[in-house]
Amino acid sequence: MNLTFDTIAAQATPNGRGGIGIVRVSGTLTTRVAKELLGKVPIQRKAEYLTFYHQNGNIIDKGIALFFPGPNSFTGEDILELHGHGGPVVLDLLLQRIITLPGVRIARPGEFSERAFLNEKIDLAQAEAIADLIDANSAQAARAAISSLQGVFSTTINDLVEKLTSLRVDIEAKINFPEENETNVSIDKKIIANLDQAILSINKIRTAAYQGCILREGIKIVITGKPNVGKSSIINALAGHEVAIVTNIAGTTRDILREYIYLDGIPVSIIDTAGLCNVSHNEVEKIGIQRAWNEIKQADHILLVVDSSTTKLSEQDKLCNTLIANFPYKTPVTIIRNKADITGEKIGETLNNNYSVITISALSSLGIEILLKYLTKIISLPSSTEGVFLARRRHLEALEITANYLLQCKEKISFPTMLELIAEDLQLAHNALSQITGKFSSHELLKKIFSRFCLGK
């Protein structure tokens, strides 16, 4: 894809003072920028120590210049990198000098990576991996981002796309050449086998992508329950400091409170919510309850808190089942029996009606270590991150759409009259997968993704 752009420039190192600061230039006018600032075009792919000149002939700085001619560069265009001293004034003088040249402007956030994508140097998943590597919160996440950048995720997706294409070819052949009855039986077996294989593949990819998404974005745990059961005390205990105001007055928490902790290197967002009461005549409290339900709908895991001092074990099932009936069907729930310091109940983990029940006293910090170990266990990833790639929520959504279309194909495969519908479902599955790598993506999606990158990337 040969595209014509303005020449762009940006600081590629963070703002502030440092030993080295880098300014990056990319585009058709890069060699002109080099001649104006350096008096020459640097030797290709070799570091040269040169002087950086102002247009009036004064010296701005001295440093290393690197020139990477396109198309064999990161963006696919000519690239110039100037490595000078990392003072903000020096770097600003360099940038201002560069953009005085006609046809050169400051780059938008992520525009270098966007050009690499548009010039087919990387795909969209690899472009996102660049931002993910920069933002990695742990060594595990960094290693997974490198895997994505090297194309592990993309290769997995492209392999499945090829399987779907092959499957669609077989379906189209059956539609277009119905008179070839001799091969119909063998084609049927081949189609069913290939479809089953594709379904197995998408399920395996979804599992790996979910793990990659947890590494990147963490997991969202929502603390909920009736008013005054100790939800705020629990978030304070898990955080290790006071996040929420704790009183004996029911309904103290009216809004959403968030706290971030790390468990085994995985970021965990813990959310305290307003108490879920049946009827409220307070408008502010009503809004808080609605926000609580919104958070519950988006949770990866729900901690349902019960006040053990007012709810006997025999009453717990009825109370919890009433609330759980309104929770998202697939979201796992753990029941927390709080205030054991009042009741004297045994601290620890038990199992009741297939739900894990953890008895604690948040106010006295009794059982908090048990709860933390339990949370670490339920969100833990495989000890080996070999082959693990980072994924985003949009990737999970695309994979879910693909899986649903393939399951629809499976339901229709026994009916010869539905072959055209199967072919259409396969095409839609193909399109959903291709959104991950950017082979089939809207302009608005691309704009949204690259706008979140930092300058100089």
UniProtKB/Swiss-Prot annotation:
GO biological process: tRNA methylation; tRNA wobble uridine modification
Residues involved in Mg(2+) binding: 232, 253
Protein's cellular compartments: Cytoplasm
Binding site for K(+): 228, 247, 249, 252
Residues that bind (6S)-5-formyl-5,6,7,8-tetrahydrofolate: 24, 81, 121, 457
Entry EC no(s): 3.6.-.-
Gene Ontology MF: a single term: GTPase activity
Cited Pfam families: MMR_HSR1, MnmE_helical, TrmE_N
Residues engaged in binding GTP: 228-233, 247-253, 272-275, 338-341
Family: Belongs to the TRAFAC class TrmE-Era-EngA-EngB-Septin-like GTPase superfamily. TrmE GTPase family.
NCBIfam families xrefs: mnmE_trmE_thdF, PRK05291.1-3, small_GTP
Subunit structure: Homodimer. Heterotetramer of two MnmE and two MnmG subunits.
Protein name: tRNA modification GTPase MnmE
Gene: mnmE
